[in-house]
Amino acid sequence: MKKPLRWLAALTVLLLPLSALAQQQGLTIDIVGGSASATPIAVIPMPYQGSDTAPQTDVSAVVGADLDRSGQFRTLPAAQIVEKPTRGTEVQFQTWRTLKQNYIVVGRVMDAGEGAYRVEYELFDVAKGERMLGLAMTARANAMRDVSHQMADAIYEKITGVRGAFWTRIAYVTASGKGGAMRYALMVADSDGYNPQTIVRSAEPLLSPNWSPDGKKLAYVSFERGNSSIYLQDIATGARELVSSFRGINGAPSFSPDGRRLALALSRSGNPEIYVMDLGSKQLTQLTNHFGIDTEPTWAPDGGSIYFTSDRGGRPQIYQVAASGGSANRVTFQGNYNATASVSFDGKKIAVAQGSGNTYRIAMMDRSLGSPSWSTLSPGSLDESPSFAPNASMVLYAAREGGRGVLYAVSSDARVRQRLVLADGDVREPAWGPYRTAH
């Protein structure tokens, strides 16, 4: 059985066979865990009040689903919404106090002309009867889900003080067919699985997608040339560039925080080592030189150092080395197997695939209070490839269930989990993208 470590797959040039699937499908979300301590919030249906064709997107449903899957909120079920105000002046706060709601969101959708819509919405503190937020947004019909995610982000941030990450994207790999007829696709979708987009198709395995910090490009590993090679690809235009095809392993690309460099694992000198490539000049700098296997680099948020997986101590653990090279320091000490690090935006948390015997789960090391504390985020037996949301509120990872691959997103406090699954296939290699910016 394949262990959750990309460098083992790279060394043996093997990939676990995946079952048939429809690659154009979006991922569907199934919340499989919740929290009784989540904050109650009523998201009232927002009716279309225009005279043209109503938008297909149910704005309030998207906003409510976003808040639910964050684990921080618990929306009021539709059957319990006894009143449907569309503006603050219509809100009867005592009704919502009786229903034990902490917050209420109301709004409406109107025509904005030329096929566009205007959404006006307000957020209220029920106990105080005070408005916390009042905004209006305009978009065309095909961007109404984007608007809905941005609304959820604003509501989330206003209440929690933490920037929301609903209007973000995820990358993942799918496959179809069996044996020699396998076909792979690198996909990008909204963080809730909608709007899937095929970035590249291949008859050979695709691995290790990694986002550029501006969200415009993906780096990934392809075996289409027979050996592993690393490509950069523009998501909007499809233009791609081959940046590494040395003899041996070319693996685990990771963009620097400024987007100018790429960390990668190469075995060009015989043993897998960590290198940094200047993407302008293509000049390589070797950071490690050890008889052990060094792989899976990921940058610290300040760009000053790189975390990586190494078995130099006998078993895979996470180490850290300066981006300019030098001696490496071991970071993880709990457990015999820690690999595939993902680092939170503030550098205080590190999510890893942690192994014990034949069981691999996602664990998180939190250094917020100084000395490291550990927590287990996933309950599976073969969980791998953790990837933090840009606000570190959730971790996306891959799992095996019923003989096929699925994705999970778990809150960083492990209170809520959600499964992202294709209707009839496998999905692996997740990577959560950066914040998006409105144009």
UniProtKB/Swiss-Prot annotation:
Its main location: periplasm. InterPro entries: 6-blade_b-propeller_TolB-like, PD40, Tol-Pal_TolB, TolB_N. Disulfide bonds: none annotated. It is found in: Periplasm. GO terms for biological process: cell division; protein import. It holds the Pfam family PD40. Gene3D superfamilies: TolB, C-terminal domain (2.120.10.30), TolB, N-terminal domain (3.40.50.10070). It comes from the Bacteria. Keywords: Cell cycle, Cell division, Periplasm, Signal. One of its GO terms (cellular component) is periplasmic space. Residues 1-22 form the signal peptide. HAMAP family: TolB (MF_00671). Part of the Tol-Pal system, which plays a role in outer membrane invagination during cell division and is important for maintaining outer membrane integrity. Belongs to the TolB family. The Tol-Pal system is composed of five core proteins: the inner membrane proteins TolA, TolQ and TolR, the periplasmic protein TolB and the outer membrane protein Pal. They form a network linking the inner and outer membranes and the peptidoglycan layer. This is Tol-Pal system protein TolB. It comes from Xanthomonas oryzae pv. oryzae (strain PXO99A).
